[in-house]
């Protein structure tokens, strides 16, 4: 029951977070800091008028920003498949791009429970 409530809550949060975010062609996520504690990062990715896809990434204590970015890229590729182009850039940065002809999309941080980790989103 607890997992069901958490899933419903995250879905509601993601729809609110996505609604407040602009849609763009490309997004850049910049990770800063290290994982002072274990936790998780949940991102919501949604195309125009599409339901958000949630990607939850478990993060182990002690990982640096480059290792965290790698884990996020792996989870995004797993969850999104070939819907978007996902690349790790400069170690700690992640680019998510739409494919030619596909609609613009939004990205939002739904949850970050990792102490010491900052996540900034930039539209491009």
Which role does the model predict for each range below?
Residues 1-4:
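Positively charged n-region of N-terminal signal peptides that target proteins for export
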Residues 10-11:
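Short, linear, compositionally biased motifs with a strong N-terminal bias
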Residues 20-124:
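Polar, low-complexity export/assembly segments characteristic of proteins
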Residues 14-17:
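N-terminal signal peptide c-region/cleavage motif recognized by signal peptidases
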């Amino acid at each position: 029951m607890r997992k069901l409530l958490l899933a419903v809550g995250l879905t509601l949060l993601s729809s609110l977070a996505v609604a407040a975010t602009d849609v763009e062609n490309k997004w850049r996520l910049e990770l800063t800091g290290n994982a002072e504690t274990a936790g998780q990062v949940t991102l919501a990715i949604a195309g125009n008028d599409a339901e958000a896809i949630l990607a939850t990434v478990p993060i182990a204590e002690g990982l640096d920003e480059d290792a965290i970015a790698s884990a996020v890229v792996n989870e995004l590729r797993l969850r999104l498949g070939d819907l978007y182009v996902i690349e790790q850039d400069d170690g700690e940065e992640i680019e998510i791009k739409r494919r030619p002809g596909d609609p613009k999309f939004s990205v939002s941080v739904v949850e970050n429970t990792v102490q010491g980790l900052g996540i900034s989103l930039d539209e491009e």
